[in-house]
Curated annotation (Swiss-Prot):
Protein name: CDGSH iron-sulfur domain-containing protein 2A
Record-level GO BP terms: autophagy of mitochondrion; regulation of autophagy
Pfam families, sorted: MitoNEET_N (PF10660), zf-CDGSH (PF09360)
Entry binding sites for [2Fe-2S] cluster: C99, C101, C110, H114
InterPro entries tied to this protein: CISD1/2 (IPR045131), FeS-contain_CDGSH-typ (IPR018967), FeS-contain_mitoNEET_N (IPR019610), MitoNEET_CISD (IPR042216)
Source organism of this protein record: Salmo salar (Atlantic salmon)
Membrane topology: Single-pass membrane protein
Topology, Lumenal side: 1-37
Source organism phylogeny: Eukaryota, Metazoa, Chordata, Craniata, Vertebrata
Domain of life: Eukaryota
Coiled coil: none
Keywords: 2Fe-2S, Autophagy, Endoplasmic reticulum, Iron, Iron-sulfur, Membrane, Metal-binding, Mitochondrion, Mitochondrion outer membrane, Transmembrane, Transmembrane helix
Gene Ontology molecular-function annotations: 2 iron, 2 sulfur cluster binding; metal ion binding; protein homodimerization activity
Cofactor: [2Fe-2S] cluster
Amino acid sequence: MVLETISRIIKIQLPAYLKKLPLPETIGGFARLTVSEWLRLLPLLGILALLGYLTIRPFLPKKKKQKDSLINLKIQKENPKVVNEIDIEDLKRTNVCYCRCWRSKTFPVCDKSHIKHNELTGDNVGPLILKKKIL
């Protein structure tokens, strides 16, 4: 029953549908098609567009996948929670940058590792900058 239905669609209904389509002889003929003729062409154009997309999809660039889901990969992993406390009065310099991406080799001080991290993951993390106010 199912094969008979498929056979009928392919052998009878599809050729009849294609014969009724208002396909112009030239490319310029598409400009002279009426709205109702365009509406009759829409199913065919939709199927052709879908087949074209499915054909080129393997060649399209893949989306970047995030390399790792953990943020902190190596800093003080033996502690359940990493906390660094710095007394602001002890700041020697006027500007100090602290790491927020957990990739710094000089943690907790930023060594600009976030730049590479942002490129790899598409993230937008930056350092925490503390400025000493001079009165």
